[in-house]
């Protein structure tokens, strides 16, 4: 099966899930992050991203941002499974790259890796290594969403909440899925008439109003770095301890209070993920950076 056909099938599956309401950070959340990012692309980034996207995406990065989730269980892609998270020691509530990303094999390491691969398009490199830059773009875009989900930097002992069995209202599930899926799904049903575009529009409005003063600091990187995922991981485990794990022990029923008090955290992380993805891609594809390195 050719690349274009495989990507067309994956895109149809993702769009079908969105229409039918099978929504989670793995599809609705990632779609939102990438859709928000697209609205903050600089002109050079728009051109570069469209060149790299498969034809099936029709110029929409958001259409393929769930691709890494779609493929990670396939035999040839199982090696990518560990790149979606960075587990941290139980109850320490902090993140350290040297401790939590052994051999660079975690979500932060993946963000650095795929950033470097995409940067190869901006450098006069004589390297004999030829990367698949379409895959690099989709992996980077997806992992930038993952790192902003607090439980993707959760405790190693419970696998980021996957081992914590809870009820979301009357549905049996686990804590990780609550944050991947159910908070977003409940928000769509409760506030947005099950419309993902309406939710994204509301987040974009908040970025122009309530969060507008925060956007410059969200999108920037210290020390003139192109990518800076370590602070994002630190934020996530801090939020996991303060919000995700709190009052959510095994056997707990999570309802209105948990939903209403945690939804603002989820919404802000989606917005931050979008802004930071745009900032990273803008730095990668900036014409000024290309000229500076020429």
Swiss-Prot record:
Q: Name one GO biological process term.
A: DNA catabolic process
* A GO molecular function held by the record: RNA endonuclease activity
Give the record's glycosylation annotations as residue positions.
113, 132, 193, 224, 247
Which keywords does this Swiss-Prot/TrEMBL entry list?
Disulfide bond, Endonuclease, Glycoprotein, Hydrolase, Manganese, Metal-binding, Nuclease, Signal, Zinc
Residues that hold a divalent metal cation 1 according to the record: 69, 84, 142, 146
Enzyme class (EC, first level): hydrolase
Per UniProt, where does a divalent metal cation 2 bind?
152, 176, 180
Tell me its EC number(s), please.
3.1.30.1
Cofactor(s) recorded for this entry are:
Zn(2+); Mn(2+)
- Cofactor binding summary note: Binds 3 divalent metal cations. Can use Mn(2+) with a lower efficiency than Zn(2+) ions.
User: Which PANTHER family does the record associate with it?
Assistant: ENDONUCLEASE 3, ENDONUCLEASE 4
What task does this protein carry out?
A: Endonuclease that can use RNA and single-stranded DNA as substrates. In contradiction with PubMed:23620482, cannot hydrolyze single-stranded DNA and does not cleave mismatches.
The name this protein carries in UniProt is Endonuclease 3
Q: Where does this protein come from, organism-wise?
A: Arabidopsis thaliana (Mouse-ear cress)
Q: Which gene encodes it?
A: ENDO3
């Amino acid at each position: 099966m050719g690349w274009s056909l495989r990507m067309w099938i994956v895109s149809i599956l993702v769009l079908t899930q969105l229409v039918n309401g099978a929504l989670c950070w793995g599809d609705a959340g990632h779609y939102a992050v990438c859709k928000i990012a697209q609205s903050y692309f600089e002109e050079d980034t728009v051109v570069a991203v469209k060149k790299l996207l498969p034809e099936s995406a029709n110029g929409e990065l958001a259409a393929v941002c769930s691709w890494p989730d779609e493929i990670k269980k396939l035999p040839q892609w199982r090696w990518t499974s560990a790149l979606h998270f960075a587990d941290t020691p139980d109850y320490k509530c902090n993140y350290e790259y040297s401790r939590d990303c052994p051999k660079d094999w975690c979500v932060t390491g993946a963000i650095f890796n795929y950033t470097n691969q995409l940067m190869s398009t901006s450098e006069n490199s004589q390297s004999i290594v030829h990367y698949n830059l379409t895959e690099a773009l989709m992996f980077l875009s997806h992992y930038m969403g993952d790192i902003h989900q607090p439980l993707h930097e959760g405790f190693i002992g419970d696998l980021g909440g996957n081992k914590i069995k809870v009820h979301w209202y009357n549905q049996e599930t686990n804590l990780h899925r609550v944050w991947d899926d159910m908070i977003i799904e409940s928000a769509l049903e409760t506030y947005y008439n099950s419309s993902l575009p309406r939710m994204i529009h509301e987040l974009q409005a908040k970025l122009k109003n309530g969060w507008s003063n925060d956007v410059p600091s969200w999108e920037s990187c210290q020390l003139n770095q192109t990518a800076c995922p370590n602070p994002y991981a630190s934020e996530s485990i801090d939020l996991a301890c303060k919000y995700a794990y709190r009052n959510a022990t095994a056997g707990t029923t999570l309802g209105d209070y948990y939903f209403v008090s945690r939804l603002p955290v989820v919404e802000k992380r989606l917005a931050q993920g979008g802004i930071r993805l745009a900032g990273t891609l803008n730095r990668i594809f900036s014409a000024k950076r290309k000229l500076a390195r020429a």
